[in-house]
Curated annotation (Swiss-Prot):
Its EC number is 4.3.2.10. This is Imidazole glycerol phosphate synthase subunit HisF. GO terms for cellular component: cytoplasm. GO terms for biological process: L-histidine biosynthetic process. Pathway: Amino-acid biosynthesis; L-histidine biosynthesis; L-histidine from 5-phospho-alpha-D-ribose 1-diphosphate: step 5/9.
């Protein structure tokens, strides 16, 4: 059995790490490099950095802090933010990122997924999906440009359809960001993640809702995800990664130690 991964998420805005609730009202929580170093020291398996306003503001993630992170940590990390071309992706990988993630640009141009996969290989292409439960239609739908509340818009895609589409086009991993659960620390959306798991043949990373150690246990056991991403519980030191790993190991979950 492959070991499950714990992945702290660092949302970046204007050169600082920020955190919001349900993708709104972001507040500054710290500096990029010190937080990255702290999580690596605590035992994180990898890190994800999202430049949350890059796509909406028509720019690419700032490469200067990418190189500084690469110099400070010895665990894999993934970078996202406005990546639209092979050359932009190549530059970020050259600056030290191990994976690149695309979200809104893939929705605008789905062929980007295939082009990146052809150039760099499936293993370093991650697709982020911002999924929102629409109570009116009783369905899960994909939203775009979610890093800027004023720019956020609905798309034509139902979440499960988009999950299938990005796999056909060659993605290597999927991060399912459950917007309704984001930042509220009430637990992962086991129902939605289980539905996606049933049609997802690539590694699936759960994102949105972690509040207790038991939430991590539940999402690994019940939704059978490959990794769990979290932000506020780590930023606010509610949960220590090393202690979380010990807890999960005691619950008979295969975890990297």
């Amino acid at each position: 059995m492959l070991a499950k991964r714990l992945v702290p998420c660092l949302d970046v805005k204007d050169g600082k790490v920020v955190k919001g609730v349900q993708f709104r009202n972001h507040e500054i929580v710290g500096d990029i490099v010190p937080l990255a170093a702290r999580y690596a020291e605590e035992g994180a398996d990898e890190l994800v950095f999202y430049d949350i306003t890059a796509s909406a503001h028509e720019r690419v993630v700032d490469k200067s802090w990418v190189s500084r992170v690469a110099e400070q940590i010895d665990i894999p990390f993934c970078v996202a933010g406005g990546i639209k071309t092979i050359s932009q992706a190549r530059e970020l990988l050259a600056f030290g990122a191990d994976k690149i993630s695309i979200n809104s640009p893939a929705l605008t141009d789905p062929s980007l997924i295939s082009r990146l996969q052809d150039e760099f290989g499936r293993q370093c292409i991650v697709i982020g999906i911002d999924s929102f439960f629409d109570a009116t239609s009783n369905s899960y739908k994909v939203k775009q440009f979610t890093g800027d509340e004023a720019a956020t818009k609905d798309t034509q895609w139902f979440t499960q359809d988009w999950v299938e589409e990005v796999q056909k086009r060659g993605c290597g991993e999927i991060v399912l960001n459950v917007m309704n659960q984001d930042g509220v620390r009430g637990g992962y959306d086991i129902k939605q993640l289980s539905l996606v798991r049933a049609i997802c043949d690539v590694p699936l990373i759960a994102s949105g809702g972690a509040g207790t150690m038991a939430h991590f246990r539940d999402v690994f056991i019940e939704a059978k995800v490959d990794a769990a991403l979290a932000a506020s519980v780590f930023h606010k030191a509610i949960i220590n990664i090393g202690e979380l790993k010990a807890y999960l190991a005691a619950e008979d979950i295969a975890i990297r130690r």
